[in-house]
UniProtKB/Swiss-Prot annotation:
Top-level taxon: Bacteria
Bias type Polar residues, positions: 427-436
GO biological process, one term: mismatch repair
UniProt name for this protein: DNA mismatch repair protein MutL
Lineage: Bacteria, Pseudomonadati, Pseudomonadota, Gammaproteobacteria, Vibrionales
Amino acid sequence: MTIRILPARLANQIAAGEVVERPASVVKELVENSLDSGATKIDIDIEKGGAKLIRIRDNGSGIVKDELGLALSRHATSKIHTLDDLEAIMSLGFRGEALASISSVSRLTLTSRPATQEQAWSAYTEGRDMQVKLQPTAHPIGTTVEVVDLFFNTPARRKFLRTEKTEFAHIDELLKRIALSRFDVSITLRHNGKVIRQYRAAHNDLQAEKRLATVCGQAFVRCMLKIELEHQGLKLHGWITTPEGARQQSDLQYCYVNGRMMRDKLINHAIRQSYETSLKPEQFAAYVLFIELDPHQVDVNVHPAKHEVRFHQARLVHDFIYQALASALAQSDSIEQPQINESAFHYQAEPEVAPLGSFPAESNEVPQAVYHAIEKAPAYPRKAGQEQQLQPVAPLESSFSSEQGREVAPAPHNERNAWMESRSPARHTTSSNQSERYGEPAPSKQQVKAYAELLHTPDFPSQNVECHPSPSIASPVQELGKAVSVVAQRYLLTTTKAGCQLISLARAEFYRILGQLNGDKAPLKSQPLLVPLSLKLEKGLVHAAQEHQDRFARMGILFKMRNEKALMVMGVPAPLRQQNLQLLIPDLLSYAASQAQKEEQAKNDTAMAQWLALRVAKVKSHYTLSEAIQIISELEQLWQEKLPLQDAQLVTSVDFSATIAQLT
């Protein structure tokens, strides 16, 4: 067969297969064109569920006579002209396919009058004849698009249309989404001559709440929490409901990116995760959320219906949404505190340590496997019987004696497993009825790994440490010697002028963290949290935070008191940035309260730094030579001439004289 260029009519009908799925698709494209034209009033008339008639009238800028025929041509648009325009797109439409595709499967009349014309003009075309017929007509400033007999020339497509009631329900739901995205636009919907919906323009908060109540119901308004947050060019605002406003189906989930309706799986995953600890498996969150960001940071041209986008900084967007919602839910009085960092429940191996002084920027690239995993992820929320937790690695026993404090390990493993068990009903059994009900298998290990790759934030890495070397010393004091080899995977053999010595890397790790937390020379710099962490505590713990507020501030831990039983964590030092603050801060306040009566210790920040170092430092099963060199190099730089060489659990001399004697 020879290769030929497709006729324009056939090409448009093929394109219509993607653009025009059902009458609601036509309404979506035409209403979005009205919004792009600056309309503040849109009237929609539907007959027979849209199969007989779809008429959209607006008061937008209109189309001049000379461009009416061109507007019905394929790939003709006023929205973009260059690639730069596409990369900075803010309009809802930009492909120039909608009108041509719709006219190829219907009888379409386009009537318009811009403010610069005294006469309105009408363009008519239908599927079999792509010729456009122009004629003068009467029309106010704005545009009217009339679509008659949808799919009249494609019987196979028309046969797949549902009942009139079903098709109109899709149109009604679509207009609800549009009404929530543009509170400043009046929208009227009629079906078979009867007014069904009338959304009046909202110009203040009270009117906006009325529209919310009209679309989402009074129950949503009673249980809603207002969200408004901005960080690093990202802005999130809108409303979410407390768990009391949870639904039995996902019918009140509306999300918008730069004003565009979205069903993006990355966004949905962040929202699901923020509600994970507060909703039952059969419950669904309800929300109306708006995400705004630089259009250069998002690609909207990745989905035929524009329902999904790709974020250039997907990790940042995901964590921003998750922490914003989790913090808002934690601050509400109706639920317990959600666990912000579940990865802290399990021991995890430490990643490779970068060279000292290296501060690599966090990569925002999301591997393709992540998107594949998200595509195959089970529907929200996690169903009973589905296992999604990564298997924990058993923590190592501490090498520290009981006299030196608590073990360097995560909080009690059994308690955390019990907590996770209580949040995952029937996690060990999955009945056949459940499989039939949900119809989706649990994610595979590869999918879970891909999720972890997207969401995992490693425990505090050494490359993010803010070191405070003494300004009086030009270079670190080399007292630990030259590294030779790692012995028994956890000890480093070094050589000095005095001979050989063995260094415990686990103990060195403790002193490294202690050096980072030691604020004797200068107060530690506090790093503000992306979203302040709200904690509900006992009165005694809040009192301890107030009593030792200056002491905590010197360590870079900043609190803001809410009331006698609640406070907010505003900032922490770099070594604590990636810790599970939801667990660590209450324990720290308990420690401070217990030491209050010991006057000398209460005034000594070193004791608190030692306690924190024991909690934060991690014990590894084995170290590489490069990791060992990194640890002792930072140790020497942090401690300078004050290296704790007197600690026998840190360093001990090794005498090879007897061994050498046997060889001679």
